[in-house]
Structure formats: C-alpha cells, structure tokens
A protein has these predicted regions:
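Conserved ABC ATPase "signature" region
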Residues: 22, 117, 121, 128-146
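Conserved ABC ATPase signature
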Residues: 150-154
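Conserved catalytic motifs of ABC-family nucleotide-binding domains
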Residues: 171
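Catalytic Walker B motif of ABC-type/P-loop ATPase nucleotide-binding domains
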Residues: 175-179
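Helical segment within the ABC ATPase nucleotide-binding domain
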Residues: 189-204
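ABC ATPase "signature
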Residues: 236-237
Length: 267
C-alpha cells in the first residue's frame, strides 16, 4: 500500500452563519449551515506539487487551515504523512511548514536571526540544532546579509524568503503555501517560483501544496491541479487532464466551464 504525504476522505467543513473562530466550536453540527468544504477527497504523493485553484470562497484557504490543524474538519478525515489532523495534531505539525503571503507574522523589531531562533525553539529544536539549521537555511535562502537586520527593514521579497526559511526550520515533509507570491512584483514573483521548484521541491523532495489565483503560476509549478468551487472538488488532475475534462484549450477556460457545469448540476 502506497504511503501518501496527504490524504483527504470526504472532508467537510461547515460554519454557523453568524459565528467564526472559536465561537464556531460552540454550535452543534445541526446548526452549521454555511458550507466551506463539501465531500473533498484526494491524495498527494511525497514530492508532488499540487495547486489549489478557485474563486474567493471556493474553500482553498479553509482546506489549508485544516491541513495545518488551525481548523478541524466537521466530517471526514484528513491525514498528513499518515497522521490524523483531528486526533494527532501535534504529530501533524511536526510534518508541515506553513507560509502565507504578506508579513508572515514576524516580530518586526527583532532581527531576522532572532526570529528564526525564536521559532526554532517553538519547534523544539535544541540550541545546537537551531544554529545548524539557521546556518544551512541562510545559504539556501540567500539570507546572509539580512540575518542581523530588523524584519521591519526588509523588502517584501526578503520577508517571503525569511518566511520560507522559518517554515523549513524543522525539515517538514510537506510545505503549505497560501498565495505565496501575493504582493510581489513580477520579477520577484518569478524568482520566488524558481526558488520553490529548484531549492525546495527539487533539492529536498518536499511535497508542495499551494493556493493561488495566478494561473500562469499554477501552470509553471503544479504537477496536478485541484479545482474547487463552493467547497466542492470539481477536478484533481494534471493540467492536460483538467483541460481534457472541461474540453477546453486553456486553464482559464477550463475553470469557467467546470464551474458552470457544476452550477447546472446542483440546480
């Protein structure tokens, strides 16, 4: 039996219409009437790159938050490297690195090095191991000149690099990215995508799962594409497979056709 980096079986997530965050936990399932994910199932092999695509509200960020254990599924089962996100969240967190676009929640008045040391401690790395990993990642991510600068003085592109370094501190098997090139200019975004493919996936064999609205980015990075709409999984296949399923010539046309088809089927 093949071991998967990620496995989802009929994952559903519902939120109460007037509650969010921790308040959502207080409502019984029967009152959870706003669907964010509905019966999502797919598997991802180790070292694979999977893109999550769909309009705002399709369920991409909700799915990523479930995989990080920030949210729990209402129904169904999600596993990361064989560990259940609901029953074994601590073990799941040891397997994943998570990075979003934006400021990545660093302590802005601390230096880049101080931030990495802090997060290494939160990931239970010893002082010696933290020093080794920071030295390794400094070379991998080109952070040498930045380590002793306050985070608030860094460019958006450099903060992205620092965020990836933080996510990779504990050698995760799976890297989860939400809009990874948001706020980057075109040149910085292109460099960031090259960096992901060559230095993260290529060099380390890391499984990469990312959500993006940039279809050119999806086509460049992803081995497979998961198309979400209204919390439902419409397709999960290679670019060629998605286009064939829709009978379209481009990814953009495919998303439009698959979304319209799903809307007709649910009427």
């Amino acid at each position: 039996m093949e071991n998967f980096a990620l496995s989802l079986e009929n994952v559903e997530k519902y939120f109460p219409p007037a509650a969010s965050g921790w308040r959502a936990l207080l409502h019984p399932v029967s009152r959870l009437t706003v669907p964010a994910l509905r019966g999502v199932s797919f598997e991802v092999k180790q070292g694979e790159v999977l893109a999550l695509v769909g309009a705002n509200g399709a369920g991409k960020s909700t799915l990523l938050r479930i995989l990080t254990t920030l949210l729990l599924p209402t129904r169904g089962r999600a596993q990361v490297c064989g560990f259940d996100v609901a029953r074994e969240p601590a073990k799941v967190r040891l397997q994943i690195g998570y990075h979003t676009g934006g400021d990545a929640c660093f302590y802005s008045r601390l230096s880049a090095r101080e931030n990495l040391v802090l997060f290494a401690g939160l990931n239970n790395l010893s002082d010696a191991e933290a020093s080794r990993r920071i030295a390794e990642l400094t070379g991998t991510f080109g952070l040498g000149e930045l380590l002793d600068r306050q985070v608030r003085t860094l460019s958006t592109g450099n903060i992205h690099r620092l965020g990836l370094a933080r996510a990779m501190l504990h050698r995760p098997s799976v890297l989860l990215l939400d809009e990874p090139t948001r706020s980057l200019d075109p040149l910085a975004a292109a460099e960031f995508r090259r960096f992901l493919l060559q230095d993260i996936v290529g060099a380390h064999g890391t499984t990469l799962i990312f959500a993006s609205h940039t279809l050119a980015e999806v086509e460049q990075l992803a081995g497979r594409i998961a198309v979400l709409d209204g919390g439902r999984l419409l397709a999960c296949d290679t670019l060629a497979g998605v286009k064939a399923a829709a009978g379209a010539d481009t990814l953009e046309e495919s998303l439009e056709i698959l979304t319209r088809r799903a809307a007709r089927e649910t009427q």
